[in-house]
Amino acid sequence: MSQEIAVIGSPDFTTGFRLAGVRKFENVPDEAKDDELDEAVTRTLEDEDVGIIVMHEDDLDHLSRNARQSVERSIEPTLVTLGGSGGASGLRDQIKRAIGIDLMDE
């Protein structure tokens, strides 16, 4: 069984992924993120067909503490965030969380 990529975010954020063929997405308008983002993340985490969740880094600030901890600690599906100011260190942390070791450790 192959696992799919799911994208969660504003329609502006998800559109490019949908055009690229990503079939699973949750559109949450910017003005509704504080109310609806937790539910969208929970639904996606519970979807057994999803292997990777893509979100914008800034959207994590709209999640409740419990939802944020759930998505950040999830191994499968794995969270990948884009944008924001995390840069290479954010990617390093995501890789370390996903596989359990720091590949860039010197």
Curated annotation (Swiss-Prot):
It is found in: Cell membrane. It comes from the Archaea. It is a peripheral membrane protein. Signal peptide: none annotated. The keyword Thylakoid does not apply. InterPro entries: ATPase_V1-cplx_f_g_su, ATPase_V1-cplx_fsu_bac/arc, ATPase_V1_fsu_sf. Has multiple subunits with at least A(3), B(3), C, D, E, F, H, I and proteolipid K(x). HAMAP family: ATP_synth_F_arch (MF_00312). This is A-type ATP synthase subunit F. The lineage of its organism: Archaea, Methanobacteriati, Methanobacteriota, Stenosarchaea group, Halobacteria.
